[in-house]
């Protein structure tokens, strides 16, 4: 499954190999191979959900604003400091949570009220269980946004919501086309009323939660 990852999900998956996977595994108390497999499902799920959100009116602008507000430091230099960011994310109670590292808050913006559904589905599909899958998503969410900030804010004034929306839209399409865990979960998570259709009511809920006020 992980070998089929492409685009931004594949690029970020490669950056997380080695020490980051080991650190997250130690935090979760899981086998590194299982953690790696779960990351391979979680990244396209997160990026795909962001891609669907950015297709809503003003969605890309809202996400770009959140990146500029909370994650702009990741756009400086030669790339975001993955080791430092992961250390902050895994620091737990020893460090004050900031908007940049607030994984639970970010998930709430990405998935709205369906964040528990995303965690439960990922946990069931990967064998992590809902609690550990939720923890993994909270670890990955700040990393995903910092990765996006490094990619799309690096040009300073050239930051373009249309380019961000297009790139994330491609991630959403790839996740759906590839099927697998992420593709199946995207449908369940985005169909918030459980009727099998992504309707206006579902989109209104998502739009209302998308990177609004903290």
Descriptions of predicted regions:
Residues 1-214:
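A structural "flexibility-hinge" signal
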């Amino acid at each position: 499954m992980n070998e089929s990852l492409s685009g931004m999900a594949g690029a970020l998956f490669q950056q997380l190999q080695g020490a980051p996977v080991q650190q997250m595994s130690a935090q979760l108390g899981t086998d590194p191979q299982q953690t790696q497999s779960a990351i391979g499902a979680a990244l396209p799920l997160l990026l795909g959900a962001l891609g669907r959100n950015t297709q809503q009116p003003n969605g890309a602008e809202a996400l770009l604003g959140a990146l500029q507000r909370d994650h702009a430091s990741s756009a400086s230099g030669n790339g975001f400091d993955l080791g430092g960011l992961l250390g902050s994310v895994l620091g737990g109670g020893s460090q004050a949570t900031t908007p940049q590292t607030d994984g639970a808050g970010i998930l709430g913006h990405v998935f709205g009220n369906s964040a528990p559904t995303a965690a439960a589905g990922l946990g069931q599909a990967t064998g992590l269980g809902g609690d550990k899958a939720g923890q993994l998503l909270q670890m990955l969410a700040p990393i995903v946004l910092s990765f996006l900030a490094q990619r799309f804010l690096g040009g300073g004034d050239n930051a373009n919501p249309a380019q961000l929306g297009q790139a994330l839209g491609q991630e959403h399409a790839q996740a759906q086309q590839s099927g697998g865990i992420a593709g199946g979960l995207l449908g369940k998570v985005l169909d918030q009323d459980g009727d099998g259709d992504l309707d206006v009511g579902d989109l209104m809920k998502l739009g209302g939660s998308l990177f609004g006020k903290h």
